[in-house]
Amino acid sequence: MKIVNFVSLIGLTILIAGSLVKNGYEVGDTATDFKLKNIDGKLVSLADFKEAKGFIVIFDCNTCPYSKAYNGRIVALSKKYSKDFPLIAINANSNEESQGDSYEDMVKYAKKHNYDFPYLVDATQEIARAYGATNTPHVFVLNRTHTDLKVAYIGTIDDSPRNASSVTKRYVEDAVDALRAGKPITTPKTKAIGCGIRWKDA
């Protein structure tokens, strides 16, 4: 009985999280830039990366078990694609609703896990809402054209959220590799598996 209630609670949480984000990007949409505070105290925007051909934007956090399970894979993605598709992590969790996700906690977490990429705080949650992010982690791969940034992939990192050794489909890597090669992305959208973003008005 307790297991059934727990599963029902998780389902309700996901439903509520999704209902709080009524808009958001779809594949093919134009993504707008943002300027958010990084863990080093500086403001970061996509425009800062003049040589980037695109971006791997990941809405993430410190506390979700799925985010923790993906941590090593996220660091690896950054190392693999930093030259032309830099990774940008964004924490949109309300620190009032999610203990352990304050800005100070982010600084400590990034240092502990040797982050070599920006880890930005979306204090107003406006960027998460604009993108339509619902879970952590939730990935948006952006492709830079001559005039703007196009959303090329939305979803999960791979097909094994809890166990890196069981991965058979690497959706983000496949998407970026396709963009690099000028080829269509085979799977441009998947379901983001993770914890619901903790909204201020939840």
Predicted features by range, described:
Residues 52-54, 82-87, 114-118, 136:
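Loop/turn elements at helix/coil->beta-strand transitions in domains of secreted/extracellular proteins
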Residues 61-70, 139, 195-198, 202:
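Short, thiol/selenol-centered motifs that function as redox-active sites or metal-ligating centers
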Residues 68-112, 123-129:
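Structural microenvironment flanking redox-active thiols in thiol-disulfide oxidoreductases
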Residues 19-47:
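N-terminal "domain-start" segment that seeds a small globular fold
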Residues 141-202:
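Thiol-/selenol-based redox modules, centered on thioredoxin-like
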Residues 107-151:
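Short, internal strand/loop/helix patches
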Residues 1-23:
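Bacterial Sec-dependent N-terminal signal peptides
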Residues 45-68, 176:
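Short active-site neighborhood of thiol/selenol oxidoreductases, capturing the structured segment around
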